[in-house]
């Protein structure tokens, strides 16, 4: 993985964890508890006659929601829950389409499943574009090498 892409994506994950006040060992239950408590404190409806406070709360709420959903999607418990489905997709369904957006490789399979691989360097993506079989390339160089959701 290219160091700057890895750093950018790891920084994003770190910022999300910091926002929610959790570390990488947080369970789904921990994430849910922190999310609910944070949303209670930052919910825009708490700021009835305070437009500035309401606007700040809306921004914080959006950030908290984004962080929560992202961290849940990469959590080991979530990945374990969907491991069988993921394994079946990457071994039995060929790639229909794929594209790179801000070092996130989005891969659409013919079975309708889409996965995002975080921190994929542009040069790896270009090699995948030029590969005879993007599915085989992904099995060898993408799957198992990058955080996915």
Model-assigned labels for residue ranges:
Residues 76-86:
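Short boundary/loop segments of OB/S1/cold-shock single-stranded nucleic-acid-binding domains
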Residues 85-149:
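Accessory regions outside conserved functional cores
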